[in-house]
Amino acid sequence: KKSGVLGRQFMINIIANLNLASPDTNYNLDGQANLTAQQTFDLYHNSIGVKIDKAYNQLMNELGYAGLEKAIKENKGIDKARLTFLQNLRGIISQEATERELPENYMQALTIEKDNQGNWQFMMPLSFPNYKRKFESIIMGILKKRVIRQNVNGGSAKQIAELGGHITSQDAGLTELKFVRYEDGRIKKAEVAIRADIAAQYGFKPGDDLSQIPEELRTIIGYRIPNQSKNSDIPLVIKYVLPDNYDQAIVVPGGITTQQGSDFDIDTLYLLMPHTKLNEETGRPEKVKVPYDKLFDENGKLDMQELNKLTPKEVDNILVDVSEAILTSPVHFKEVVTP
């Protein structure tokens, strides 16, 4: 999949054990900003809040509820706005009712008509006892799907641990996939080979020399469900692109089996990937950048106004950048690699 649900357990565990009292700037975001644990926590927590708010506002706009609220506030165009809202609500409920194969009388109950005061309404109130539970279930399901469950760029892939006995060649760039390690004074990401359809999002194809492509475009955050702690998460960098016949697969270094407690059935690795855009001058994809220099004031406090100005793709990339910063921080290295 090219998108997937942001795991609830992952969201909780990724910011666990941050020393919020420490003044040390242990977290480097996208090579732009060095943050303290408190700043990192605030940015991550509020970014998820902004993401949820944007999803909620989008749904309310699609339903016409935001327009109805505005009409009531201005005391103008209320009748038209109410009709639009009921039509949109009926449409979205109808779609869910069809998928659930509900009887036709549920749709008949949503016939829109005027009451004795001339106001638009459903033929039967949504709270009518015979229909209440089904309609409540549908509406809550819509909110859960569109607002509570947050989607991110990435998706999932079936992990295959790399086995020994294959050909390696330093000259050709063919080497074994390396696990997370401390090297040259910093934490290096684990190397993976990904399937062609995911690679295509970034303009990669089988056989490409990825060593010439910026690491920020090849960075992925992987995590498993159930997610018990940071040893269920791993920072990854794409080293190879698999042939087209590797459907839904990601090849990982053997060390991940011990780290995450994967067993020998088919385990799924869930992926967080940065959003990209096409550079019109070069014709190549590049990472959507977050203006971190604008997100904190001179006192180091998060500026919520600036955070709310960001696009959904920029907010998503904050989640990727924060996750990468935490998982590659020496402070959490032991948590990541210890089974």
Which residues make up each language-model segment?
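Core catalytic machinery and nucleic-acid-binding channels of phosphodiester-processing enzymes
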Residues: 1-339
